[in-house]
Amino acid sequence: MDMYDIDFVSVGKHGVTLEEKLKESAQRVVDLADLVSGENFDVALSKHSIELPRVAFGLAIPSLFVLDNEHAMAANKLTLPLCSKIIVPSIIDEWKLMQYGANPNDIIKYNGTSELMHFNNFKFNENVFDDLGLDLPLQKTILMRPEPSLASYLNTDCRKSVLSPVVDVLKEYANILILPRFKEQAEIFEGIKNVTILKPPVDTSSIIKACDLVIGAGGTMNREAAILQTPVISCYPGDTLSVDQFYVDNGLMYRTTDLEDITKQALSFIVNPHKPIELKTDNLFELIVDKTYELGNSKK
């Protein structure tokens, strides 16, 4: 938001332990309620926010919820029963969402994933590496994104990463760029040969497109790489998300958690990247705008 000079108000912060997560979530509800109740909002629009649908429901504001993770049990149970409309990728099984309390009549499906929105006005910066002053001694460059260790749906140690053994092998063959999620993750990879730790905010879209390969233990950046046609390996340590399977099925993502397989495929991809693959999707931007206006008009 800062990078694109967009005015915004930041509300709340994350917790690490279960107790901290609960307390911080409760505080975000309070802070959001104070912010929202002082204004005349017509619609609450969120992407997998736990707090905004709850605040909107309590203040009788219609809410439009964009969902992409059917495995986020806690978040889905706390939000889906309260949402006016839920926009989901067609590949996600709506019966799974109904188990969390979603009304099937409120589910709106589209072909694609939410990451399509990230590239509506994307302009590739071919000089992104030079602009960042990166020292890249090797011919090939791999971008890596560690797992979302602090997320409620993934119970992992934030001081470790599934990418560590991958880095140990591939650092001899390519420059490694690490985009950590928080300070503890950055510390895991500090001081390693041929490894550069990126410090946000950076133009991640241009970095993804400029790299020869992306290896991600999360989700969003992997799907962005698939859309940009950069070879990508997903080693997400949880169950495979349907939105990831969408790109696997279309030949734009390779999914594995086996170290030997990851390194083998990585070396293959940086030498022989796949040819461009046509991806047919719906216009998610138009869908969100249309449904936002529909909900806003329904309140009047």
List where the protein language model places each region.
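Active-site regions of enzymes building and remodeling cell-envelope glycoconjugates
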Residues: Y4-V9, I61, G101-G112, I188-P201, ...
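Leloir-type glycosyltransferase catalytic cores
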Residues: A102-L134, N250-K300
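Active-site and donor-binding regions of nucleotide-sugar-utilizing enzymes
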Residues: D2, I6-G101
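A donor-sugar binding/catalytic signature common to diverse glycosyltransferases
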Residues: A44-I50, V55, F65-L67, I207-D244
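Catalytic donor nucleotide-activated moiety binding site of glycosyltransferases and closely related
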Residues: D2-K23, M144, V167-L198
